[in-house]
Regions:
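Extracellular leucine-rich repeat
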Residues: 2-474
Length: 474
């Protein structure tokens, strides 16, 4: 009995202590929250812009599974200049959007929680050393759509956790050596649309110090005439759209999974273009202004390719029967290819040696091709997928889907054209000869005429005039 009572007392005491600690903790949280709130207000609703559209939107979200607090601040489209911003960011800030303002330099902001900073669409023309060094937790930095042309060495110092760096649509040209070296875990780098980047002359990896383990690199519209990247760098995605490349660069990382080489100056796709792309699963050869031919074996080495697109390469008019390798292998080999697009090209026909390959596809896009629907192409009707290919010739089925046009309309002239010519010519010759013969046949024969003229029955025959015996009776 006594022991039960003491147990009850102990448990009561325990509950009390527990309650007390909870209460204290709560008070502490409330106090901290009050401090944050004041600080947040100072940043989000500054005195100078109270009750105007220039105040930022601040929202609390609970990020991460542990329910840590995180503050997202959206100050986009506010016409802010650098001097308008408070440099110390509120506690718990996670992301700050300063896009579409009028910042002409990057303010040296300070926060040890900020993960994402968006400065796109401002008027920043240069970065100075240590520009981001007080943002020690930064993971993503978006600096696209400015006019950054000058970067001091050390511009990216103090960003050991940065994973994504966007420098697209700027004016990068001469860059200090080892510029990117402080970015130890950088995974994605976008330098697209820096039209003078070809002048930088430095090798990205050894010269500019890009993280060896970079996985995504974008170099669209950088006026590149050639490119060498280390073969053994573990790069996964590379975009080289809209450059001045005449061949697919021979030396690219072996690990590439996705390559976009669209809108470059290739005229033909050759076997050496794809020879080293042994791991590529997605290959984009779109919008090529000059590409006319895909030569035999041009795509024979890309065994693991899943997606291939020639979309909108408007000069492309020849796809070799053996573009995907010798006929023998295409008919037996199981390829990984699932999606193939020739949309908007000038291809008229496909050799039936491609049938086994096309039959495996889950997607084949033939929209807008001027297809020549003759007996060579009738196999296309048998494909299990809808290609949206339409006949352009012959004229009587123009515009009809290959699948809905009648099979017997896909006919070929069994004789070659010159044979028709020959037949017509010989017909003309024959009838000429016939007419000649008829004319000759109808014309009176000279011998016959003479005989008739002087023959016995002819009125012109010789007559003998006998004397009139009645008038001279002797
Ligand atoms: C952008 O900066 C340049 C100088 O770098 C200046 O001449 C120009 O007026 C600025 N534009 C805006 C919209 O502030
Ligand atoms: C960069 O590209 C421009 C435009 O194509 C060209 O005029 C210039 O010579 C190139 N510079 C280098 C160093 O390749
Ligand atoms: C493939 O890569 C190797 C190693 O970089 C290179 O020597 C070779 O020329 C490349 N082959 C072709 C056909 O480009
Ligand atoms: C299709 O390709 C094979 C093998 O290259 C070739 O012999 C044949 O003539 C081609 N057919 C047509 C209609 O071009």
């Amino acid at each position: 009995m006594a022991s039960l009572k003491s147990l009850q007392i102990v448990s009561g005491l325990l509950t009390f202590v527990l309650l007390l600690t909870q209460l204290l903790a709560h008070a502490h949280v409330v106090q901290a929250e009050n401090i944050d709130a004041a600080e947040t207000d100072r940043f989000c609703y500054p005195e100078s812009s109270k009750n105007t559209r220039r105040s930022c939107e601040c929202s609390n979200v609970s990020a991460s599974p542990w329910g840590n607090r995180a503050l997202r601040i959206d100050c986009s489209y506010k016409d802010y200049r650098s001097a308008d911003l408070s440099l110390v960011l509120p506690l718990y800030i996670d992301s700050l959007d300063l896009s579409w303002n009028a910042l002409d330099s990057v303010p040296i902001l300070s926060s040890d929680t900020l993960h994402q900073l968006n400065l796109r669409h401002n008027n920043v023309s240069q970065l100075v050393a240590g520009n981001f060094k007080l943002l020690t937790s930064l993971r993503e930095l978006y600096l696209g759509w400015n006019s950054i042309g000058r970067l001091e060495a050390g511009s990216f110092d103090g960003l050991p956790h940065l994973q994504v760096l966007d420098l697209a649509h700027n004016n990068l040209h001469l860059l200090p050596g080892q510029l990117f070296a402080p970015l130890l875990v950088l995974g994605t780098l976008d330098i697209s649309w820096n039209r003078r980047f070809n002048e930088s002359g430095e090798d990205l990896y050894t010269g500019l110090g890009v993280n060896w383990k970079l996985s995504t690199l974008r170099l669209d519209a950088c006026n590149l005439g050639d490119l060498h990247l280390p073969v053994n760098a573990p790069l996964k995605e590379l975009s080289l759209r809209r450059n001045q490349l005449k061949r697919i660069p021979a030396q690219l990382p072996e690990t590439l999974l996705r390559l976009d080489i669209s809108d470059n100056l290739l005229e033909e796709l050759l076997p050496e273009d794809t020879f080293n792309l042994t791991q590529v699963r997605q290959l984009f050869i779109e919008d090529m202004p000059l590409l006319q031919r895909v030569m035999s074996n041009a795509l024979a080495h890309v065994d693991v390719l899943e997606t291939l697109s020639f979309q909108n390469s408007r000069q492309l008019s020849h796809l070799d029967a053996e573009a995907f390798g010798p006929t023998m292998t295409t008919s037996t080999k199981k390829t990984a290819l699932r999606s193939l697009s020739f949309r908007g090209t000038m291809l008229r026909t496909f050799n039936s040696t491609l049938a086994p390959l096309f039959t495996q596809l889950a997607e084949l896009d033939l929209n807008g091709l001027p297809l020549q629907c003759d007996c060579e192409l009738v196999w296309l009707k048998q494909l299990p997928v809808e290609t949206n290919g339409r006949c352009y010739k012959p004229a009587r089925i123009r515009g009809m889907l290959v699948t809905s046009a009648r099979g017997d309309a896909f006919s070929c002239d069994t004789w070659p054209r010159w044979a028709y010519g020959l037949v017509v010519l010989s017909l003309i010759a024959l009838s000429a000869a016939g007419i000649y013969l008829i004319v000759m046949g109808l014309r009176p024969h000279r011998g016959v005429t003479m005989r008739r003229k002087v023959g016995a029955g002819s009125p012109y025959a010789r007559v003998t005039i006998e004397p009139n015996r009645q008038e001279n009776p002797h």
